UniProtKB/Swiss-Prot annotation:
It is found in: Mitochondrion. Residues 1-98 form a transit peptide. It comes from Mus musculus (Mouse). This is Mitochondrial translation release factor in rescue. Residues 130-178 form a coiled coil. A motif (GGQ) lies at residues 74-76. Belongs to the prokaryotic/mitochondrial release factor family. Methylation of glutamine in the GGQ triplet by HEMK1. GO terms for molecular function: ribosomal large subunit binding; translation release factor activity, codon specific; tRNA binding. Keywords: Coiled coil, Methylation, Mitochondrion, Protein biosynthesis, Transit peptide.
Amino acid sequence: MSSRSTWALLRLPLPLIRICSGKWGLRLQEKPALLFPGMAASTVQVAGRKDYPALLPLNESELEEQFVKGHGPGGQATNKTSNCVVLKHVPSGIVVKCHQTRSVDQNRKIARKVLQEKVDVFYNGENSPVHKEKLEAERRKRERKKRAKETLEKKKLLKELREASQNITEKKADADGIPRGFQE
């Protein structure tokens, strides 16, 4: 059975499979935080980001690229190799550091995507698709918070009504002389 027919059995859209499949099989990717000038974000946060066709293209002559030694978890293999990419957009002064994978090529691609988004936000501001998505995510978060608050208030009201009805039932039973263990 070919790998193509195996994926067909899962009935997932092909673009989703390409995004989510990797070295270790299918995995869910969480939505990353959005990037704005001055806002710090690790490259791990931007792993599953959508591609925006309307972003400003990067001119390779305006970029300075360096490869430095990595850091963090992974032990000596990570700390000895120079697979961490530092990419600088000279005109804007934006610097991106990417050490998400052990592969230099993958880190270069990820760094360019992140830099392209940051440069687009830097030059286009509120008109940038990245900025628009950030605003939409904030709106959805506010709506979820509002719904959760309303649900909590309804639950509190229901609890108060239950307690009030139990108190009335107990008072009525006390007035009728029925022992508490024999109430309905």
